[in-house]
């Protein structure tokens, strides 16, 4: 059994029911909208976000779930899908997970309106059912994701950023959404357990941090499926291995690195030289150590809960983040 199927196994029935509920939450009286949302639903990824919601909900409650849990997972998916549709417009991207993006097929104007529609559907799903605590969790996440993107744009102009700024960017851009999924799962079944909700939010944040550092490492190795090496350097993205080396090498080497990324980022030979330089100066070892620290912090939180199929699945999920090839 594939690792993702193993993770999904304890919540297989819930995931099947969620699919039906999620489809109906997208429905509209406008035929064009239905056609586009049908296209979106049929090209979904691994569905890690709702899996986090359900597994956490069941782990903290001893196997219980409620309609609130399904609504929470739907709200996360609706609002996150809205942000992805808008992202593709902003990035002028024609592909999403190997398929044509909404803006590629229906142009930017329709893509922006579809994103707005999905956002409003997510908001109304919470408001109509009085799930204001769940709505607050995802709203904070969307705010932080926007701030993280803008912080990255602001700092990208200066390539010599410090490690603390890098962590804040990836916390907001990547980790905050996984943190919201985990907090949402806990809050949907035990809304009064504020300490436990915060604990699960932190658990998700640690996984998200490890996930992004793993993504950074893919840029320097041939391990990744579907991500060519050096792509982050070509796009002038600051990754942890590069930041570490920039902060530990000599001033002359630092200037060469910054110059390479700023002016020669499209030169294949120079990009290869940068990759080798980062490897030789222990950038990958340092990033791997940091990634494993976040992994361990997440596992330490899981250790506080009694053994259950849901805890085991979440442990698998944490380790999958580190061991994945894509």
Located regions from the model:
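All-alpha prenyltransferase/terpene-synthase fold signal
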Residues: 1-326
